[in-house]
Protein backbone atom coordinates (compact mmCIF):
# COMPACT_ATOMS: atom_id res chain seq x y z
CA UNK A 1 0.00 0.00 0.00
CA UNK A 2 1.51 3.34 -1.03
CA UNK A 3 1.97 6.18 1.44
CA UNK A 4 -0.58 8.24 -0.48
CA UNK A 5 -3.19 5.52 -0.27
CA UNK A 6 -2.45 4.85 3.38
CA UNK A 7 -2.93 8.53 4.12
CA UNK A 8 -6.33 8.50 2.44
CA UNK A 9 -7.36 5.37 4.34
CA UNK A 10 -6.43 7.00 7.64
CA UNK A 11 -8.27 10.21 6.72
CA UNK A 12 -11.42 8.18 6.06
CA UNK A 13 -11.15 6.25 9.33
CA UNK A 14 -10.45 9.47 11.25
CA UNK A 15 -13.80 10.86 10.07
CA UNK A 16 -15.66 8.62 12.50
CA UNK A 17 -16.03 10.05 15.98
CA UNK A 18 -18.20 9.55 19.04
CA UNK A 19 -20.43 12.37 17.78
CA UNK A 20 -20.46 10.98 14.23
CA UNK A 21 -20.33 7.16 14.53
CA UNK A 22 -21.91 6.65 11.11
CA UNK A 23 -21.38 8.59 7.89
CA UNK A 24 -22.58 8.55 4.31
CA UNK A 25 -20.15 8.49 1.38
CA UNK A 26 -20.93 12.15 0.70
CA UNK A 27 -20.14 13.10 4.29
CA UNK A 28 -16.85 11.20 4.11
CA UNK A 29 -15.96 13.00 0.88
CA UNK A 30 -16.76 16.38 2.41
CA UNK A 31 -14.65 15.67 5.49
CA UNK A 32 -11.63 14.25 3.66
CA UNK A 33 -11.58 16.04 0.32
CA UNK A 34 -10.92 12.70 -1.37
CA UNK A 35 -12.25 12.37 -4.93
CA UNK A 36 -15.56 10.53 -5.16
CA UNK A 37 -14.22 7.68 -7.31
CA UNK A 38 -11.29 7.09 -4.95
CA UNK A 39 -13.52 7.34 -1.88
CA UNK A 40 -15.93 4.72 -3.24
CA UNK A 41 -13.06 2.37 -4.07
CA UNK A 42 -11.30 2.74 -0.71
CA UNK A 43 -14.54 2.42 1.26
CA UNK A 44 -15.40 -0.79 -0.62
CA UNK A 45 -11.95 -2.21 0.25
CA UNK A 46 -12.37 -1.26 3.90
CA UNK A 47 -15.77 -2.98 4.00
CA UNK A 48 -14.26 -6.12 2.43
CA UNK A 49 -11.66 -6.25 5.21
CA UNK A 50 -14.16 -5.54 8.03
CA UNK A 51 -12.57 -2.18 8.81
CA UNK A 52 -15.86 -0.50 7.92
CA UNK A 53 -19.37 -1.91 7.92
CA UNK A 54 -22.15 -0.81 5.60
CA UNK A 55 -25.40 -0.05 7.41
CA UNK A 56 -28.91 -0.58 5.97
CA UNK A 57 -29.38 3.17 5.44
CA UNK A 58 -26.39 3.41 3.06
CA UNK A 59 -24.17 4.76 5.81
CA UNK A 60 -20.94 3.35 7.17
CA UNK A 61 -19.47 2.80 10.62
CA UNK A 62 -16.25 1.39 12.06
CA UNK A 63 -16.03 -2.38 11.64
CA UNK A 64 -15.22 -5.16 14.07
CA UNK A 65 -11.65 -5.55 12.79
CA UNK A 66 -10.72 -2.19 14.33
CA UNK A 67 -12.02 -3.35 17.71
CA UNK A 68 -10.07 -6.61 17.41
CA UNK A 69 -6.85 -4.71 16.72
CA UNK A 70 -7.52 -2.34 19.59
CA UNK A 71 -7.91 -5.25 21.98
CA UNK A 72 -4.38 -6.38 21.05
CA UNK A 73 -2.73 -3.07 21.89
CA UNK A 74 -0.23 -3.13 24.79
CA UNK A 75 -2.42 -0.62 26.64
CA UNK A 76 -5.51 -2.83 26.45
CA UNK A 77 -3.57 -5.92 27.48
CA UNK A 78 -2.02 -4.16 30.48
CA UNK A 79 -5.40 -2.76 31.49
CA UNK A 80 -7.04 -6.19 31.49
CA UNK A 81 -4.22 -7.73 33.49
CA UNK A 82 -3.68 -4.98 36.06
CA UNK A 83 -6.85 -2.93 36.38
CA UNK A 84 -9.89 -5.08 35.68
CA UNK A 85 -9.93 -6.86 39.07
CA UNK A 86 -9.93 -3.49 40.83
CA UNK A 87 -12.67 -2.11 38.56
CA UNK A 88 -14.79 -5.16 39.32
CA UNK A 89 -14.20 -4.79 43.06
CA UNK A 90 -15.35 -1.17 42.98
CA UNK A 91 -18.40 -2.18 40.97
CA UNK A 92 -19.30 -4.94 43.44
CA UNK A 93 -19.06 -2.53 46.38
CA UNK A 94 -20.90 0.43 44.84
CA UNK A 95 -23.14 -0.96 42.09
CA UNK A 96 -22.19 2.16 40.10
CA UNK A 97 -20.41 2.80 36.80
CA UNK A 98 -16.65 2.37 37.16
CA UNK A 99 -14.33 3.86 34.55
CA UNK A 100 -10.63 3.85 33.83
CA UNK A 101 -9.22 6.60 31.62
CA UNK A 102 -5.82 7.77 30.41
CA UNK A 103 -4.60 11.09 29.06
CA UNK A 104 -4.55 11.05 25.27
CA UNK A 105 -3.67 13.62 22.62
CA UNK A 106 -0.59 14.78 20.74
CA UNK A 107 -0.59 18.24 22.35
CA UNK A 108 -2.17 19.77 25.47
CA UNK A 109 -4.70 21.58 23.25
CA UNK A 110 -5.78 18.23 21.78
CA UNK A 111 -5.72 16.33 25.07
CA UNK A 112 -8.77 14.45 26.30
CA UNK A 113 -9.66 11.57 28.59
CA UNK A 114 -9.59 8.27 26.70
CA UNK A 115 -11.70 5.60 28.39
CA UNK A 116 -9.86 2.29 28.31
CA UNK A 117 -11.97 0.31 30.76
CA UNK A 118 -15.53 0.37 32.04
CA UNK A 119 -17.86 -1.68 34.21
CA UNK A 120 -21.50 -0.58 33.99
CA UNK A 121 -23.40 -0.26 37.23
CA UNK A 122 -26.91 -1.71 37.48
CA UNK A 123 -28.17 1.20 39.63
CA UNK A 124 -26.37 4.06 37.92
CA UNK A 125 -27.48 6.87 35.64
CA UNK A 126 -26.54 6.29 31.97
CA UNK A 127 -23.49 8.26 30.85
CA UNK A 128 -22.01 9.15 27.47
CA UNK A 129 -18.66 7.53 28.27
CA UNK A 130 -17.72 4.13 26.89
CA UNK A 131 -14.57 2.07 26.44
CA UNK A 132 -12.66 3.65 23.56
CA UNK A 133 -14.62 6.90 23.89
CA UNK A 134 -13.15 10.32 24.55
CA UNK A 135 -14.42 13.07 26.84
CA UNK A 136 -13.11 16.55 27.65
CA UNK A 137 -10.75 16.85 30.58
CA UNK A 138 -12.35 19.87 32.25
CA UNK A 139 -15.87 18.39 32.40
CA UNK A 140 -15.19 14.90 33.78
CA UNK A 141 -13.93 13.54 37.07
CA UNK A 142 -11.28 11.41 35.39
CA UNK A 143 -10.27 14.39 33.28
CA UNK A 144 -9.81 16.68 36.27
CA UNK A 145 -7.77 14.00 38.05
CA UNK A 146 -5.53 13.80 34.99
CA UNK A 147 -5.25 17.59 34.73
CA UNK A 148 -4.20 17.82 38.37
CA UNK A 149 -1.09 15.81 37.55
CA UNK A 150 0.11 18.12 34.76
CA UNK A 151 2.86 20.69 35.25
CA UNK A 152 2.42 24.44 34.75
CA UNK A 153 3.96 24.54 31.27
CA UNK A 154 1.54 21.86 30.09
CA UNK A 155 -1.44 23.59 31.72
CA UNK A 156 -0.61 26.96 30.16
CA UNK A 157 -0.74 25.37 26.73
CA UNK A 158 -3.93 23.49 27.62
CA UNK A 159 -5.72 26.65 28.78
CA UNK A 160 -4.79 28.50 25.58
CA UNK A 161 -7.94 27.01 24.01
CA UNK A 162 -11.49 27.75 25.27
CA UNK A 163 -13.19 25.39 27.71
CA UNK A 164 -16.53 24.45 26.17
CA UNK A 165 -19.70 23.95 28.21
CA UNK A 166 -21.13 20.42 28.08
CA UNK A 167 -23.97 21.35 30.47
CA UNK A 168 -24.95 24.50 32.36
CA UNK A 169 -22.81 23.22 35.26
CA UNK A 170 -19.55 22.81 33.33
CA UNK A 171 -16.66 24.92 34.61
CA UNK A 172 -15.46 27.01 31.67
CA UNK A 173 -13.46 29.64 33.57
CA UNK A 174 -9.71 29.00 33.77
CA UNK A 175 -9.23 30.62 37.17
CA UNK A 176 -12.07 28.61 38.71
CA UNK A 177 -10.78 25.35 37.30
CA UNK A 178 -7.22 26.09 38.39
CA UNK A 179 -8.43 26.61 41.96
CA UNK A 180 -10.21 23.27 41.81
CA UNK A 181 -7.05 21.56 40.53
CA UNK A 182 -5.19 22.85 43.58
CA UNK A 183 -7.90 21.33 45.81
CA UNK A 184 -7.68 18.03 43.92
CA UNK A 185 -3.93 17.82 44.47
CA UNK A 186 -4.42 18.54 48.16
CA UNK A 187 -7.20 16.03 48.88
CA UNK A 188 -6.15 13.37 46.35
CA UNK A 189 -9.37 12.99 44.35
CA UNK A 190 -11.56 14.89 41.86
CA UNK A 191 -15.34 15.32 41.69
CA UNK A 192 -17.93 16.54 39.21
CA UNK A 193 -21.60 17.40 39.62
CA UNK A 194 -23.63 17.31 36.40
CA UNK A 195 -20.74 18.88 34.48
CA UNK A 196 -20.74 16.30 31.68
CA UNK A 197 -24.09 14.54 32.12
CA UNK A 198 -27.14 16.00 33.84
CA UNK A 199 -28.16 14.07 36.94
CA UNK A 200 -24.73 12.47 37.25
CA UNK A 201 -21.94 12.99 39.77
CA UNK A 202 -18.51 11.37 39.76
CA UNK A 203 -15.48 10.81 41.94
CA UNK A 204 -12.07 10.10 40.39
CA UNK A 205 -8.64 9.29 41.76
CA UNK A 206 -5.35 9.62 39.84
CA UNK A 207 -3.41 6.35 39.69
CA UNK A 208 0.28 5.52 39.22
CA UNK A 209 1.22 4.35 35.76
CA UNK A 210 0.21 0.79 35.04
Where are these regions (language model features)?
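N-terminal helix-turn-helix
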Residues: 1-76
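A structural signal for short hydrophobic beta-strand segments in well-ordered beta-sheet cores
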Residues: 52-53, 100-101, 207
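Amphipathic alpha-helical effector-binding/dimerization core
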Residues: 61-160
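Short, flexible active-site loops
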Residues: 158-168
Amino acid sequence: MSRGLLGRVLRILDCFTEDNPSLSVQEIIERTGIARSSAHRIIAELVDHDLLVRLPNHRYSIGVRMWEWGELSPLSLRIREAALPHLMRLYEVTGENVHLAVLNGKTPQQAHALFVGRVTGFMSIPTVSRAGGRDPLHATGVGKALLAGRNETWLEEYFSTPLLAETQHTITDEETLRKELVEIRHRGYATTREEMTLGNISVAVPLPRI
